[in-house]
C-alpha cells in the first residue's frame, strides 16, 4: 500500500488551505481517471482526509473535497459506496453550509449515492430519518436539503420510498409549523407532491394526523386539486396499498436491484444544477465529443442537438423545483475515454432522417380483429409501465406498437384504435423519462410515428410526453438528448394546441441552456408550420419568447433565436417590428448582419448593379464588421459615390429586395427608420443610378440617363418593368391612399426631401448609425426650387440645432460642434455621447478621448452636463476592464471642471463608484478608483456629499454587494476623519448632524452590521464610523443614538469605551496616550503616508477664500505651524498578509513569542493589539496552525493576576477566536467560561464586567448548548460568589433571547429551577438578574410552560414577574406600531 498513488498523495495533506487546494487539484485529476484501491485502510484514510476538508472553514477546500468525492464515486462506486454511507453524516452537515454551491454539491452527491447500482433511495432516507439529523436537524438549511431530496425521490422512485414517506408524514406536518419560512414552504410542497403522487389514500392519512390546522389543511387540499388539474408532467398513477401485502416486493429486493435491469429508478423530468458534467445515472457516463468530431461524424441532416455544446462537453444542468427538485449528477470528464475504444462520438445523435427510417423498421405483426389489437396494446401498456421489466422487452413492445399501426387493414375500427393509443399516453411518457437510451430512442420514434400518422387525433399523447421530452433534452447522453429534441420537433409540427405552447413557454426561464436552445429551434418550426388561427391568440407570447432567445446568454440559443426572428419577420412583419424596437442596438446590429448574410444570395441575382463597378463595397463591409472606426473610410471614395443615395435596409429580410426606398418610407412607424437605413454609409451598399424623376435632374449630366430596368420588391419578376414617372415615385413612397392622391409634382418634391435628408445623414460615415434615436438636425442645403412651393416642406428644414458657445471661449468650435475624430472631422457632443455607447471598442475609445476635450469647456450648459454625467455613469457600470482607467480619468477631469453643475448627478455617480470599488480589480484599477474617490472628496461640498451618500445608502432601489457597502461606509469615514490633509474640505467640528437622512443612514448601518452574512466584513468600518461621528459632534451623536434600540446604544457605548472616546475633553497629550493604550483599531492613512492633522481645522468656507490668496508655500507653513505629528507607534495595517501565508506565519509567530513574555507587559499588550487588529481586518487566516497555541496563551493571560496586562483585549481576542473557529472550542467549553469568570472576578477594573458579559454572550451563542447549561447549573448551585452568579445569569438571559424556541423548550426544565433559586438569594443584584431571566423565559415559552417552576414563589414575587412581563409586551407592541 505504501506505493499506491493515492496513499502517496494523502501523505502530503497538511492543514494549510493553500496546500490543500494544490493537492486537491492533483487528487481530483488522478481520481477522475483511476480507480481507488479496495484496501480498507487506504479507503478509510482517504475518506478521513476528505471529511476533514469538508468540516473545515475554507469554502474552496470544501468545494474541491466534494468534487473529489464525486469523481471517486463515479470511478469506483463498487469500492466506495458502503464507506460513503458510513460517513453520510458529514454530507448531511454540508447541506447546511453557508455557500449555495457547497449545499448543492452535497445534495447532488447524496443523490448520486442513492442511485448507485447496489444502493437505493431507501438507504439514504434511513440516514435522513435518524434523530438529530436530516429532517430533525437544528439547522434549517439541512432541513430544506433533506426535504428537497425527499421530493426528488417522490418524483423519481415513488414505489420504492412510499412506505418511508408514509412514516414521515407526521414529521412533515410538524415541519409546516417550523419557525423558518423556507422550511415551511418546502415541507408544504413536499406534502402536496406526496398527495399528488399517492392520491386520495395519502390525503386521508395526512388529514388523520390532525397535526395541521383546518385552515392550512384547506389550503393544502386546494393546492393539491389545482396541481392535479393543471400540471401536465405528473408521473403515472400508482396504486398505493397502505399495509404491506404478500404481493409487495420485500425491502431487501428493492435495496438489491438486479444488474440486468438498470432502469428501475425513474428519473424526474427536470434537470438540476450540477458541478460536473451530468449524465443518466443508470448508464455508463458518456461525454460529448469535440466540435471537430461532431462535424466529421454527424449525418448530413443533424437534429437540433446533434452538435455538441461549445463548453467542451460539460453541459450544465439546472434545478427546476416546479417539476422535480433535484437531480443526481453522474457525468464524467472526457479524459476517461482518451485511450478507450468505447468513447462515444457525435454519430450517436439521432436525426430526423433516422426517425423516418425507423418508422417502418419493425417486425411484421398479423392483426386478426379489433379484440386482437386491444389485447396486444394493453399488454404493451402493462409492460411499458413496469419499471422492473427487462429493457429489451420494453423496447420490443414499443416497436410492436408501430407494427400494429402499420399492419392494420380497413376492417379495423379507427376510432377504437385511436382511443387505445390515447390510453398509452402515460406508458409512453414513462418510457420517455427512462434512463436507458435504447428505451428513450424507441419511445421517441414511436411517438413521432403516431403524430406523423394520426396528427391531432392523438393530441393527448403529445401533451403528455412533451414535458418529459423537453426535460430529456438537457441530459448529456447524446442519444437521449437528440431523440428527445427530434421528438419535440415532430410534436410542434403536427400538434397545434394551446397546451403545447404553454408547455414550451415554461422553458423560457429554464437554467439549462440546452432546453432554452431547443425552445428557440421549435419556435421557428411553430411559426412556420402552425396556421394563423392557432397562432393569432398567442402571437404576442411567441414574440416575447423569440426576444428572450435573441437576448439569451448562450451563443447557440441566440443564433437559433435570430433564425426564429427571420421566420417571424417573414410571416408577421408587424410583430417583428415590435421586437426589433425593444432590442438594444447591439442586438439590432446582429439581426441586420445575420439576416443580410443569410439572404445575400437571394438578392444577388435581382440586383441591377454590376458587382464589378463597386470595388470598394466588400472592403468597407469588412471594416464595418470588424468594428473599425467609420472615420477611417476614404473621403474621396465617399465623394465619388455621394450622388447614389439609395440605402439598403438596416435590417434585411429574407424576401427579395430592390434598391429604392421601401414602401413604408412615409409611415411614422419604427419600421420606416429601421428598414430605410438612415445614416447608412452609401459606399458600402449596392446602389442604383438616379433618374431625373428622382430629384437630381440638374445635378450632373452623368446621371441623367438612369437605368430603367429596376424592379420593385412588391412586383413579380415576370411583370413589365415599364413605369411612368409618377408610378415610379409612388412605388418608392408606398401604396397608401395618401400617396395615391398626390400629383406628380408633389410626389417628386416629397421624394427629393427624403433623399436630401438621407444625404445629410450619410456624411458622418458612422459604423453605429443604428444607435441614433432621432435624425440629426443639420444646416439646410440648397433644395430644388419646386420644393419651396410645395405644401410638404418641413417646418424645421431651415433651422439648425447647435449649442451656442461664447466667442471668447478657447474651446469654441468653428462650426458649432466640439471634438474631432481620428480623421480630423468635427464632432458634436451628441455624436460623441452616441459613440460612447457604441458596441465597437475602438469607436468607444476614440469617443472617450474626444470627450476629454469637451468636458473642459466651462460654457457647457446644465443639460449637456447631465447627459455627459449619465453617459459616464453607464460607462463606469459596464465593467469594461480595457477602458476603465480612461473612464475614471475622464470622470476626474469632468468633476474638476464642472462640479458646480453636478449636484443632481453626485448621488448616482457615487453609487456607481461604490459598486465598482466593491468588485475585484487589478492594482492599477484600484489606484485609479482611489484617485477618483479623492477627486470627489476634495471637490464637492462635504455637507452635500454626506447628504448624497446617506440618501443613496437608504434608497431601497439600489442593492449593493457587501464590499460595496464597505466602500460606502469608509467614504463617510473619510468625510468625518479629514483624511486628505492637502485639501481639508471635510466636515467641520460641531457640524449639525442630527438630520433625517443621517438618522436613516445610521439605522441602515446597524441593519447591515447585524446581518449575520455580512456583519463581520462591515464591523471594522462601523466601529470607525461611530467613533468618527462622536468625535465630530458629541451632542448630535447623543440625540441620534438616543432614539435607536437599546442593543444599538449598548454596542456604540462599548465601542466608544474600547476606543477611548469619552465625553469629557482632556488635554491633547493625555488624550493621545489614552487613545494609544485603549484603541484596538487605528486607521492607517492611504498609501502609508504620514498625515499631519491640524489642531485648528480649516473650515470649508475659510479654505475657499484663502486658497486663492495664499501660495502653496505659505499654506504649508501655516499647516506645519499648527500641526502635531502623529504618534510613532500607530499600528500599521496587516491586510496584505491575508494571502501571503509565509509572511503571515512569521508575523504571528513573533507576536506569540511576545505574548509569552509576561515580564514585559507593554510588548505583550502591543502584541495582543496587533493580533486583534489582524482578526478585525480579516488577515488572520492560519487558524489551524496557531489556534491551539494562541488559545493556551490567552488562557494564561486571563489567569494571571497582573494588573498591567490588558485582559479586556484578551477577552476580545477570545471572542474573535470563538466567532471564527467555534468548533475548535467545543471540547474546552467549560474551561473557556471558567477562565472568563475568573478574569472578571479577580480584576480591579470596574469595566471588566462589561467585557466579560460580551465574551460570555459570544461563547454561549457559539458553543454546544448542553455544555453551556451544564456548567451554568454547576456554578449556580455550588458557587457562593455573587459576581460569578450574576455573570452566569446575564449570560443565560441573553442566550434565552437568541436561541430557537425548540432548543429553549429542551432546556427549560434544567435552567428554570436555577433562576427560581437565585430569586431567593440575599443579594439584590442576583435577585434582579433572576427576575429578568424568568421574564425572558415567560416571554419565550409562555406562562403555562413555566407555571410548574413558579409554584414555589410567593404572590408578591409572582406579581413582580407579571408586572415586568406586561411592560415588556407593551413596549414591544409600541415599537411595532411605530
UniProtKB/Swiss-Prot annotation:
InterPro entries listed in its UniProt record: ARM-like, ARM-type_fold, CLASP_N_dom, HEAT, HEAT_type_2, TOG
Superkingdom in the source lineage: Eukaryota
Positions of HEAT repeats: 168-206, 1305-1341
Coiled coil region boundaries: 740-767
Effect of deleting the gene: No visible phenotype; due to the redundancy with cls-2 and cls-3. Simultaneous RNAi knockdown with cls-2 produces defective microtubule cortical contacts resulting in abnormal nuclear rotation, defects in maintenance of spindle length and spindle displacement. Simultaneous RNAi knockdown with cls-2 and cls-3 shows nuclear rotation defects and excessive spindle displacement.
One GO CC term, this protein: spindle microtubule
Record-level GO BP terms: astral microtubule organization; cell division; establishment of mitotic spindle localization; mitotic spindle assembly; positive regulation of microtubule depolymerization; spindle elongation
Region feature Disordered, mapped onto this chain: 231-254, 266-325, 590-725, 775-823
Biased composition (Polar residues): 620-630, 637-648, 677-690, 786-812
Biased composition (Low complexity): 269-283, 610-619, 664-676, 704-721
Bias kind Basic and acidic residues: ranges: 775-784
GO terms of molecular function: microtubule binding
Subcellular location: Cytoplasm, Cytoskeleton
Keyword list, A-Z: Cell cycle, Cell division, Coiled coil, Cytoplasm, Cytoskeleton, Microtubule, Repeat
Family: Belongs to the CLASP family.
Cited function: Microtubule plus-end tracking protein that promotes the stabilization of dynamic microtubules. Operates redundantly with cls-2 and cls-3 in regulating microtubule processes which position the spindle during asymmetric cell division.
Name the UniProt record assigns to this protein: Protein CLASP-1
Amino acid at each position: 500500500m505504501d506505493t499506491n498513488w493515492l496513499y502517496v498523495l494523502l501523505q502530503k495533506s497538511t492543514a494549510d488551505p493553500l496546500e490543500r487546494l494544490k493537492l486537491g487539484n492533483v487528487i481530483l485529476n488522478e481520481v477522475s481517471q483511476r480507480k481507488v484501491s479496495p484496501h480498507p485502510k487506504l479507503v478509510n484514510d482517504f475518506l478521513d482526509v476528505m471529511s476533514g476538508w469538508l468540516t473545515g472553514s475554507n469554502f474552496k477546500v470544501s468545494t474541491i473535497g466534494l468534487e473529489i468525492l464525486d469523481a471517486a464515486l463515479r470511478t469506483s462506486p463498487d469500492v466506495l459506496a458502503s464507506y460513503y454511507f458510513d460517513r453520510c453524516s458529514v454530507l448531511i452537515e454540508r447541506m447546511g453550509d453557508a455557500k449555495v454551491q457547497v449545499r448543492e454539491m452535497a445534495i447532488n452527491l447524496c443523490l448520486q449515492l442513492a442511485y448507485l447500482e447496489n444502493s437505493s433511495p431507501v438507504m439514504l432516507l434511513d440516514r435522513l430519518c435518524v434523530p438529530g439529523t436530516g429532517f430533525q436537524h437544528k439547522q434549517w438549511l439541512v432541513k430544506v436539503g433533506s426535504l428537497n431530496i425527499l421530493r426528488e425521490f417522490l418524483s423519481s422512485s415513488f414505489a420504492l420510498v412510499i412506505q418511508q414517506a408514509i412514516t414521515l408524514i407526521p414529521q412533515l406536518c410538524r415541519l409546516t409549523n417550523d419557525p423558518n419560512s423556507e422550511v415551511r414552504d418546502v415541507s408544504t410542497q413536499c406534502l402536496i407532491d406526496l398527495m399528488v403522487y399517492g392520491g386520495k389514500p395519502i390525503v386521508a392519512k395526512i388529514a388523520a394526523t390532525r397535526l395541521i390546522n383546518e385552515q392550512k389543511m384547506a389550503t393544502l387540499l386546494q393546492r393539491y386539486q389545482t396541481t392535479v388539474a393543471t400540471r401536465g408532467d405528473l408521473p403515472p398513477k400508482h396504486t398505493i396499498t397502505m399495509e404491506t401485502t404478500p404481493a409487495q416486493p420485500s425491502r431487501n429486493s428493492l435495496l438489491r436491484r438486479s444488474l440486468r435491469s438498470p432502469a428501475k429508478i425513474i428519473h424526474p423530468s427536470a434537470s438540476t444544477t450540477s458541478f460536473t458534467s451530468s449524465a443518466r445515472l443508470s448508464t455508463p457516463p458518456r461525454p460529448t465529443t469535440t466540435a471537430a468530431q461532431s462535424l466529421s461524424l454527424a449525418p448530413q441532416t443533424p437534429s437540433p442537438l446533434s452538435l455538441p455544446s461549445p463548453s467542451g462537453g460539460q453541459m450544465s444542468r439546472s434545478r427546476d423545483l416546479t417539476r422535480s427538485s433535484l437531480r443526481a449528477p453522474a457525468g464524467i470528464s472526457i479524459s476517461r475515454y482518451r485511450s478507450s475504444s468505447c468513447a462515444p462520438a457525435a454519430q450517436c445523435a439521432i436525426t430526423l432522417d433516422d426517425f423516418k427510417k425507423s418508422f417502418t423498421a419493425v417486425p411484421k405483426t398479423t392483426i386478426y380483429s379489433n379484440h386482437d389489437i386491444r389485447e396486444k396494446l394493453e399488454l404493451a401498456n402493462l409492460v411499458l409501465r413496469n419499471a422492473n421489466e427487462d429493457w429489451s422487452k420494453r423496447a420490443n413492445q414499443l416497436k410492436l406498437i408501430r407494427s400494429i399501426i402499420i399492419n392494420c387493414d380497413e376492417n379495423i375500427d379507427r376510432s377504437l384504435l385511436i382511443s387505445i393509443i390515447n390510453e398509452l399516453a402515460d406508458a409512453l411518457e414513462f418510457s420517455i423519462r427512462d434512463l436507458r437510451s435504447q428505451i428513450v430512442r424507441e419511445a421517441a420514434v414511436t411517438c413521432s410515428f403516431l403524430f406523423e400518422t394520426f396528427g391531432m387525433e392523438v393530441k393527448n399523447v403529445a401533451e403528455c410526453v412533451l414535458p418529459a421530452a423537453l426535460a430529456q433534452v438537457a441530459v448529456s447522453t447524446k442519444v437521449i438528448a437528440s431523440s428527445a429534441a427530434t421528438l419535440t420537433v415532430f410534436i410542434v409540427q403536427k400538434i397545434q394546441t394551446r397546451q403545447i405552447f404553454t408547455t414550451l413557454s415554461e422553458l423560457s426561464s429554464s437554467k439549462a441552456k440546452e432546453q432554452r436552445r431547443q425552445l428557440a429551434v421549435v419556435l421557428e418550426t411553430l411559426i412556420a408550420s402552425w396556421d394563423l388561427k392557432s397562432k393569432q391568440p398567442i402571437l404576442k407570447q411567441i414574440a416575447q419568447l423569440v426576444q428572450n432567445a435573441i437576448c439569451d446568454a448562450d451563443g447557440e440559443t441566440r443564433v437559433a433565436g435570430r433564425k426564429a426572428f427571420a421566420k417571424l419577420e417573414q410571416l408577421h412583419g408587424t410583430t417583428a417590428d415590435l421586437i426589433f424596437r425593444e432590442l438594444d442596438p447591439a442586438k439590432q446590429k446582429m439581426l441586420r448582419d445575420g439576416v443580410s448574410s443569410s439572404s445575400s444570395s437571394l438578392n444577388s441575382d435581382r440586383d441591377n448593379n454590376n458587382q464589378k463597378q463597386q470595388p470598394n463595397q466588400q472592403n468597407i463591409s469588412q471594416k464595418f464588421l470588424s468594428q473599425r472606426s467609420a472615420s477611417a473610410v476614404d473621403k474621396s471614395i465617399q465623394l465619388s459615390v455621394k450622388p447614389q443615395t439609395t440605402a439598403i435596409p438596416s435590417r434585411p429580410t429574407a424576401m427579395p429586395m430592390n434598391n429604392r426606398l421601401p414602401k413604408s418610407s412615409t409611415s411614422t412607424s419604427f419600421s420606416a427608420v429601421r428598414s430605410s437605413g438612415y445614416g447608412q454609409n452609401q459606399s458600402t451598399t449596392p446602389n442604383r443610378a438616379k433618374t431625373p424623376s428622382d430629384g437630381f435632374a440638374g445635378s450632373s449630366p452623368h446621371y441623367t440617363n438612369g437605368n430603367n430596368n429596376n424592379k420593385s420588391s412588391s412586383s413579380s419578376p415576370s411583370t413589365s418593368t415599364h413605369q411612368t414617372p409618377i408610378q415610379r415615385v409612388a412605388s418608392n413612397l408606398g401604396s397608401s391612399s395618401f400617396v395615391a392622391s398626390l400629383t406628380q409634382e408633389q410626389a417628386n418634391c416629397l421624394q427629393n426631401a427624403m433623399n436630401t435628408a438621407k444625404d445629410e445623414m450619410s456624411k458622418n460615415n458612422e459604423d453605429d448609425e443604428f444607435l441614433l434615436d432621432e435624425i440629426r438636425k443639420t444646416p439646410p442645403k440648397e433644395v430644388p426650387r419646386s420644393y419651396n412651393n410645395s405644401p410638404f416642406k418641413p417646418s424645421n428644414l431651415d433651422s439648425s440645432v447647435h449649442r451656442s458657445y461664447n466667442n471668447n471661449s478657447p474651446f469654441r468650435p468653428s462650426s458649432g460642434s466640439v471634438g474631432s475624430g481620428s480623421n480630423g472631422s468635427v464632432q458634436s457632443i451628441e455624436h460623441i455621447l452616441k459613440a460612447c455607447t457604441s458596441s465597437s471598442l475602438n469607436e468607444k475609445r476614440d469617443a472617450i478621448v474626444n470627450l476629454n476635450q469637451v468636458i473642459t469647456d466651462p460654457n457647457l450648459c446644465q443639460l449637456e452636463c447631465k447627459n455627459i454625467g449619465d453617459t459616464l455613469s453607464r460607462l463606469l457600470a459596464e465593467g469594461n476592464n480595457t477602458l476603465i482607467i480612461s473612464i475614471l480619468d475622464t470622470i476626474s477631469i469632468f468633476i474638476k471642471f464642472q462640479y458646480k453643475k453636478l449636484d443632481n448627478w453626485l448621488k448616482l455617480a457615487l453609487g456607481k463608484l461604490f459598486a465598482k470599488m466593491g468588485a475585484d480589480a487589478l492594482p492599477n484599477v484600484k489606484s485609479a478608483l482611489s484617485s477618483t474617490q479623492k477627486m470627489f472628496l476634495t471637490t464637492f461640498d462635504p455637507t452635500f456629499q454626506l447628504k448624497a451618500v446617506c440618501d443613496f445608502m437608504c434608497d431601497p432601489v439600489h442593492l449593493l454587494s457587501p464590499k460595496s457597502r464597505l466602500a460606502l461606509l469608509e467614504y463617510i469615514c473619510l468625510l468625518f476623519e479629514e483624511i486628505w490633509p492637502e485639501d481639508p474640505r471635510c466636515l467641520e467640528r460641531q457640524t449639525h448632524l442630527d438630520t433625517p437622512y443621517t438618522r436613516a443612514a445610521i439605522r441602515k448601518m446597524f441593519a447591515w452590521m447585524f446581518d449575520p452574512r455580512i456583519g463581520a466584513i462591515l464591523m471594522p468600518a462601523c466601529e470607525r464610523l461611530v467613533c468618527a461621528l462622536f468625535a465630530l459632534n458629541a451632542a448630535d451623536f447623543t440625540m441620534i443614538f438616543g432614539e435607536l434600540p437599546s442593543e444599538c446604544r449598548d454596542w456604540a457605548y462599548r465601542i466608544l469605551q474600547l476606543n477611548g472616546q469619552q465625553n469629557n475633553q482632556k488635554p491633547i497629550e493625555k488624550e493621545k496616550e489614552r487613545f494609544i493604550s485603549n484603541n484596538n483599531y487605528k486607521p492607517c492613512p492611504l498609501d502609508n503616508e504620514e498625515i499631519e492633522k491640524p489642531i485648528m481645522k480649516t473650515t470649508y468656507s475659510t479654505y475657499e477664500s484663502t486658497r486663492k490668496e495664499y501660495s502653496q508655500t505659505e499654506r504649508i507653513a501655516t499647516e506645519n505651524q499648527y500641526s502635531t505629528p502623529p504618534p510613532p507607534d500607530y499600528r500599521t495595517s496587516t491586510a496584505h498578509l491575508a494571502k501571503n501565508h509565509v509572511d503571515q506565519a512569521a508575523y504571528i509567530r513573533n507576536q506569540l513569542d511576545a505574548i509569552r513574555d509576561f515580564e514585559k507587559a507593554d510588548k505583550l499588550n502591543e502584541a495582543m493589539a496587533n493580533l486583534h487588529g489582524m482578526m478585525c481586518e480579516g488577515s488572520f487566516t492560519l487558524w489551524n496552525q496557531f489556534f491551539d497555541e494562541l488559545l493556551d496563551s490567552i488562557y494564561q493571560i486571563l489567569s494571571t493576576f497582573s494588573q498591567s496586562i490588558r485582559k479586556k483585549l484578551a477577552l476580545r481576542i477570545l471572542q474573535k477566536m470563538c466567532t471564527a473557529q467555534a468548533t475548535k472550542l467545543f471540547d474546552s467549553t467549560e474551561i473557556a467560561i471558567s477562565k472568563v469568570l475568573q478574569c472578571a472576578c479577580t480584576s480591579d477594573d470596574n469595566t471588566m464586567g462589561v467585557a466579560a458579559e460580551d465574551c460570555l454572550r459570544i461563547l454561549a451563542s457559539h458553543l454546544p448548548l448542553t455544555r453551556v447549561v451544564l456548567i451554568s447549573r454547576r456554578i449556580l448551585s455550588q458557587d457562593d460568589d455573587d459576581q460569578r452568579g450574576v455573570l452566569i445569569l446575564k449570560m443565560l438571559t441573553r442566550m434565552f433571547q437568541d436561541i430557537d424556541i425548540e432548543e429553549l423548550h429542551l432546556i427549560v426544565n434544567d435552567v428554570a429551577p436555577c433562576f427560581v433559586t437565585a430569586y431567593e438569594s440575599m443579594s439584590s443584584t442576583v435577585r434582579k438578574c433572576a427576575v429578568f431571566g424568568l421574564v425572558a423565559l415567560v416571554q419565550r415559552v409562555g406562562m403555562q410552560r413555566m407555571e410548574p417552576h413558579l409554584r414555589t414563589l410567593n404572590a408578591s414575587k409572582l406579581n413582580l414577574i407579571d408586572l415586568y412581563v406586561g411592560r415588556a409586551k407593551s413596549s414591544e407592541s409600541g415599537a411595532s406600531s411605530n
